[in-house]
Amino acid sequence: MKGEPIESVKVGLEAMVSSLRTDPFALESANISIITFDREVKVLLPLTPLEDVQLPNIETPESGPTHTGAALELLCKQIDKEVTLSTPEKKGDWMPLLFLMTDGKPSDLQVYNNIIPEVKKRHFASIVACAAGMKAKVEPLKQLTDQVYTLDTLDSSSFKQFFKWVSASIGVGNRSIGATDDLVLPPPPEEVNVVI
């Protein structure tokens, strides 16, 4: 993702953080982490309480591979390190929500296929995948989750609507790890298409 699309993602992230900061419950319970994946996989923002989030600058290469599998491996390590499970003696963290956005397909397909069962073992309240742009492939995302969406227009208005929906999803997704009911997300905006 380069140029206007990545700038639009940045605007959308800023709008999401601003929106969440107006929700007193989110201020007390939401934490945000950002992992980027292209030819390098990086934790740009470790799991950080919402009130302390300073969005980092997201830089992308001109072109190159999309290491989605390596990103999910790093995600599993970060979840294991940063998220506290509930025990009989101690209340744990809220169940995390995973929002994965890609404008391509996994370049490291074998790693991607191998890590999917590990991701599913983690205690996510929901895993939502977004195929952004016409070159994004939904088939690999459907292996990860049933909740796959497409965003065909990569402008700031579309990304703002997408991240507004993400904010609303975070609001309904704050549940303790160990809850068993499926999370029902709010309906997506018209800019976001459901993949069936």
Please place each PLM-identified region on the residue numbering:
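VWA/integrin I-like adhesion module and closely mimicked acidic/polar interface patches used
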Residues: E7, S86, G104-Q143
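Short beta-strand-loop
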Residues: E28-I58, V138-L144
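Von Willebrand factor
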Residues: M1-L45, V53-W94, L97-M101, S126-P140, L151-Q161, ...
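P-loop NTP-binding core
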Residues: S18, S86-K90, N193
